[in-house]
Regions:
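Short, Lys/Arg-enriched charge-dense amphipathic segments
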Residues: 40-52, 78-95, 122-129, 142
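Generic detector of solvent-exposed, compositionally biased contiguous segments
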Residues: 43-59, 101-114
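Generic preference for hydrophobic/aromatic residues in regular secondary structure cores
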Residues: 21-25, 66-70, 104-108
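A structural "domain/chain start" motif
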Residues: 2-55, 139-142
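Surface-exposed short loop/turn segments
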Residues: 55-100
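Short secondary-structure boundary motifs at beta->alpha junctions and helix caps
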Residues: 95-141
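A short acidic, often aromatic-flanked loop/helix-cap motif at beta-alpha or helix-coil junctions
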Residues: 33-36, 77, 116
Length: 142
């Protein structure tokens, strides 16, 4: 009778890990509001990292110890050229705060001549996606 109880306990433990909730990382954004709002940046983070990736990432970099930071900067030069720099980083977490000591970091940048503000914002979103994908690929092999 002792063995079935152990087997049942093992099955319950295994089942709970299969149906575990998707981990939620602390993500902070410090972008220039003219190019990207915080809500847009957080939506890009959410779309770039799916549930499967987050679960795998949590095994190597636990939610309680790590978080992400993004920053999109740029604007227009005097010659009306849109210049954008986007950076994504994995940083250590200390309680509810992130420590700016990047473990992994990636920067993507580009410039586009004769761009409107809408074009410049779209370019900023593309560059942030590239930076996030680069950091993600350096963390776990997909």
């Amino acid at each position: 009778m002792h063995i079935p109880k152990l087997l049942a306990a093992a099955l319950l433990a295994g089942a709970s890990t299969l149906h575990a909730a998707t981990p939620t990382y602390l993500v902070m954004d410090f972008s220039t509001e003219a190019l990207m709002s915080k809500s847009d940046a957080l939506a890009i983070w959410k779309n770039q990292l799916d549930d499967k990736q987050l679960k795998r990432l949590n095994k190597l970099y636990p939610v309680s110890k790590w978080g992400f930071v993004s920053q999109v900067e740029g604007g227009f030069t005097a010659d009306k050229i849109c210049v954008v720099t986007a950076r994504a980083m994995l940083v250590p977490r200390s309680g509810k705060a992130l420590v700016f000591k990047p473990n992994k970091s990636s920067t993507a940048f580009d410039a586009k001549a004769n761009a409107s503000l809408v074009d410049c914002k779209a370019l900023a979103a593309v560059k942030l996606k590239e930076a996030i994908a680069s950091v993600d690929s350096s963390l776990i092999a997909l």
